[in-house]
Amino acid sequence: MGANSKSVTASFTVIAVFFLICGGRTAVEDETEFHGDYSKLSGIIIPGFASTQLRAWSILDCPYTPLDFNPLDLVWLDTTKLLSAVNCWFKCMVLDPYNQTDHPECKSRPDSGLSAITELDPGYITGPLSTVWKEWLKWCVEFGIEANAIVAVPYDWRLSPTKLEERDLYFHKLKLTFETALKLRGGPSIVFAHSMGNNVFRYFLEWLRLEIAPKHYLKWLDQHIHAYFAVGAPLLGSVEAIKSTLSGVTFGLPVSEGTARLLSNSFASSLWLMPFSKNCKGDNTFWTHFSGGAAKKDKRVYHCDEEEYQSKYSGWPTNIINIEIPSTSVTETALVNMTSMECGLPTLLSFTARELADGTLFKAIEDYDPDSKRMLHQLKKLYHDDPVFNPLTPWERPPIKNVFCIYGAHLKTEVGYYFAPSGKPYPDNWIITDIIYETEGSLVSRSGTVVDGNAGPITGDETVPYHSLSWCKNWLGPKVNITMAPQPEHDGSDVHVELNVDHEHGSDIIANMTKAPRVKYITFYEDSESIPGKRTAVWELDKTNHRNIVRSPVLMRELWLQMWHDIQPGAKSKFVTKAKRGPLRDADCYWDYGKACCAWQEYCEYRYSFGDVHLGQSCRLRNTSANMLLQYI
């Protein structure tokens, strides 16, 4: 009886939510709303860096091991072959750093479909450790989303944007994906992009400008894209990219940092995540293209405003790279007048974000690092001279009706490095001697010493600094509504609201609200007035890791509630209310040991089902909870 009751309740809830989310009709006569059947919306998922499976498209015999590579064998990520046949695995992963072609003996290509982004290394042990979008898709199924309504658009995350289009026609295919979704389901799509996937989507929007006649560009966007959720977007780059370039980042894999560096520097996409200055812009290729004259490559350089040279560190918290290089050669006369200590004293050079993006760093260490020439080649050919636009320039708000920028915050994040020669041959010729972290209110070194710099009250998500994540706050208008609410389910007693907060363009906006200790909050910055017919929102999730944010149940709950709110013709506000958050699923119910009953008695009840192993597992949504979403209108 218990099992049947659970099945009936679960089915009833799913059917109810399916009707509410997917079957609603809109009658709102507002330009920001999609006019039509919301059951016809599609979801387009663009994964981040290293978040798509790569499969072999070669036959490679690996000596000294029975594990060879055959067509469609998993390459990224197969830890078994990585451990037993690392040289073969390396050949299937590496690219030529100059022309981005495959290794002569092995080539890999991105997998397709949703399975390519759910688990990178499927298996009983490795699967849970390499999960990316699996939990996201579980929510889609639980809330009754149709299988053809969610579309993944994997890509070869090793390539630069120009090579993605040149080799795979990726952006042509992405355009067709949007058009197919519209034709198949009859409505526009919602874009979910994570990490570098946002860079891919931004490039697509700029590429689309040159693909579609200017007078049809905005119309195409309105017809095909209802909302854009930018999750963990490195809008001004990530310092980990330059760390990977100089010393290698292993991502916890059983490879040396030198091997990781060789791979990373063969991928031109590593530079796509390079930090850059908010004060420097490139030529507007769009207007040059339609003005009748082709832009000269030698003129497509950075143009920086006065603030770049008046402010420190290109607006970042500190100099991103501080590197020791051997002293320059001196004449014999000068050598006589120098002590041995002075003669051996290395030179410490510091570089800002602008000096990383324009190649100054690589030119300075060109004589000491064999990778510098290759990096300069990639930087100029694939980014500075990109035929669409220079991706290493600050973002403007995408011309989409509804934009939601979402990221984690308040975690200790790397913002700068000290490098020195290691005395070892390439690729291990640099060693990190110190790391600078941003903490709330200060910058500290790896040893805990306070460092001078532009420290802010908010920090990043452990991977991308706050300065880069929060750039989207510049997309908000002069008046912003701020709401801070606890991340867990709550009754509204700890919700803080400030309306019409002044926001000066170019400056940060921070919620000046008191937080209870040991409580994680989510802060909403919302603006629906500054741009007629458009909505912009920024969500800051406390203590949410960059790589895990797409698995956050809090994020998924808020996303579904916002979409549920949007489909309601009787919605009284532009954004879903934050006044209260109750359980939405059986998994949200739990046992309150202090009261010896299920928490949230209004929504949950104790209902044992065969196989339950603890009290909390027997707490389930009540049969009467099907109308619980009505409070969010």
Curated annotation (Swiss-Prot):
GO terms for biological process: leaf senescence; sterol catabolic process. It is a single-pass type II membrane protein. Induction: By senescence. It is an enzyme of class 2 (transferase). The active site is at S195 (acyl-ester intermediate), D461 (charge relay system), H505 (charge relay system). InterPro entries: AB_hydrolase_fold (IPR029058), LACT/PDAT_acylTrfase (IPR003386). It is found in: Microsome membrane. It comes from the Eukaryota. One of its GO terms (cellular component) is intracellular membrane-bounded organelle. Residues 30-633 are lumenal. The chain crosses the membrane at residues 7-29. Residues 1-6 are cytoplasmic. This is Phospholipid--sterol O-acyltransferase. The lineage of its organism: Eukaryota, Viridiplantae, Streptophyta, Embryophyta, Tracheophyta. The gene is PSAT.
